[in-house]
Swiss-Prot record:
Belongs to the immunoglobulin superfamily. AMIGO family. This is Amphoterin-induced protein 1. The chain crosses the membrane at residues 373-393. It is a single-pass type I membrane protein. The gene is Amigo1.
Length: 493
């Protein structure tokens, strides 16, 4: 019994030693010492000011902060480190001579959050240069020689919050990076000061939210003087935005090769800036934004009657959306007034006042009024044209009259206006004279110079003897005579 018990104990001892050796072999890994000319403190590796031409090899995998500033590095290749530094969150490469960075240089450091490339010799930011840094929050590129910035250089950098590009030679920056909220959604600071910018998309800049404009630095650029530029910066000054308030003296523009401060009203002769109110018509749908200088703030709206808008206003048309904006379903006249937005954050509070003017008519009804007035005006013009056509273009009946025969040499003529109830008949045309009504009534008018008014003779004048005419022939009226309607002597023929 005793030998078997000893044998069993021996086997247990050997098994324990084997398991111990296996665990040691599995957990064992090469220990990397601190590189030469570097200072290691826990997970911080400092190799600054060592005149290094290349990055030290065999960097410890636990490194969280790597300082390579103030050296002689000129190129950052894809294989600059053979070790994948997944714990590295800060990389300092400032004050070197870097003029080339590979598009795959940041693949070994996918969790980098802070990258300092300032004070180098970079000229171009190529396409997808920083696209592998999806966790990067701060990028320093100031004091380089950057001229060209590709619009896709900062692709897939959803966590980027601060981008420093001052003291370069940039003449055009792709501002669509900040206009499109999906490109760099968390960007709160963009420093483009001390560059070569001459023109700005002023209309697009006005539409940016206040928290973007608050961190958009544009001072010390040779901007072209313009009243719209003054209006833009005056609005930022009115809102107390840091990008203007901190550098008012450095905001200048160029006119006739001379520098002028943007706020020089005497020189610009620009109208003074006044904050405009929101305008709406009856029945309009309107959304008023609480344009705060910081993101993620809690917003509370107060109506002109000093009532807090919780979910729905007193008249049932005003609500507050999830993003803190004031929404009007159908604007009413009583909705007009000054609304106040109280924004509260962890370290900053802000109060905004917005005036709403409501016009007491619908926009559609206003167009109907204009259409009615236009139709009335057109109708009046057409009426005047028709009257003018009737007066000046109506055919004259005298055009259709035949040429009258001249009167006889005695001047005897029968000037009459025939008034008859039946058509004229020739009495000698045959048939019985009693078969039809052939009685004519005429008012004779004096034809000669010896007659006075109403057929009476003037003193000293004689009535001329008329010349006999053929049987059945009518006398021609004298064209020089007056119409017989003024005669008072009826004659039955």
């Amino acid at each position: 019994m005793q030998p078997q018990r000893d044998l069993r104990g021996l086997w247990l001892l050997l098994l324990s030693l084997f398991l111990l050796l296996f665990e040691v072999a599995r957990a064992g890994r090469p220990v990397v010492s601190c590189p030469a000319n570097c200072l290691c403190a826990s997970n911080i590796l400092s190799c600054s000011k060592q005149q290094l031409p290349n990055v030290p090899q065999s960097l410890p995998g636990y490194t969280a902060l790597l300082d390579l500033s103030h050296n002689n590095l000129s190129r950052l290749k894809a294989e600059w480190t053979p070790t994948r530094l997944t714990n590295l969150h800060s990389l300092l490469l400032s004050h070197n001579h870097l003029n080339f960075i590979s598009s795959e240089a940041f693949v070994p450091v996918p969790n980098l959050r802070y990258l300092d490339l300032s004070s180098n010799h970079l000229h171009t930011l190529d396409e997808f240069l920083f696209s592998g840094l999806q966790a990067l929050e701060v990028l320093l590129l100031y004091n380089n020689h950057i001229v060209v910035v590709d619009r896709n250089a900062f692709e897939d950098m959803a966590q980027l919050q601060k981008l420093y590009l001052s003291q370069n030679m940039i003449s055009r920056f792709p501002l669509e990076l900040i206009k499109d909220a999906n490109r760099l959604p968390k960007l709160t600071l963009l420093d483009l000061s001390s560059n070569k910018l001459k023109k700005l998309p002023l209309t697009d800049l006005q539409k940016l939210p206040a928290w973007v404009k608050n961190g958009l630095y544009l001072h010390n650029n040779p901007l072209e003087c313009d009243c719209k530029l003054y209006q833009l910066f005056s609005h930022w000054q009115y809102r107390q935005l840091s990008s203007v308030m901190d550098f008012q003296e450095d905001l200048y523009c160029v006119h006739s090769k001379k520098l002028h401060n943007v706020f020089s009203l005497d020189f610009f002769n620009c109208s003074e800036y006044k904050e405009s109110a929101w305008e709406a018509h009856l029945g309009d749908t309107l959304t008023i934004t609480c344009d705060t200088k910081q993101q993620g703030m809690t917003k509370v709206w107060v109506t002109p009657s000093n009532e807090q808008v919780l979910n729905q206003g007193a008249n049932g048309t005003v609500t507050v959306s999830e993003d803190g904006n004031l929404h009007f379903k159908e604007v009413q006249v009583e909705d007009g007034g000054v609304y106040t937005c109280y924004a509260m954050g962890e370290t900053f509070n802000e109060t905004l006042s917005v005036e709403l003017k409501v016009y007491n008519f619908t926009l559609h009804g206003h167009h109907d009024t204009l259409n009615t007035a236009y139709t009335t005006l057109v109708g009046c013009i057409l009426s005047v044209v028709l009257v003018l056509i009737y007066l000046y273009l109506t055919p004259c009946r005298c055009w259709c009259r035949g040429v009258e025969k001249p009167s006889s040499h005695q001047g005897d003529s029968l000037s009459s206006s025939m008034l008859s109830t039946t058509p004229n008949h020739d009495p000698m045309a045959g048939g019985d004279k009693d078969d039809g009504f052939d009685r004519r009534v005429a008012f004779l008018e004096p034809a000669g110079p010896g007659q006075g008014q109403n057929g009476k003779l003037k003193p000293g004048n004689t009535l001329p003897v008329p010349e006999a005419t053929g049987k059945g022939q009518r006398r021609m009226s004298d064209p020089e005579s007056v119409s017989s309607v003024f005669s008072d002597t009826p004659i039955v023929v």
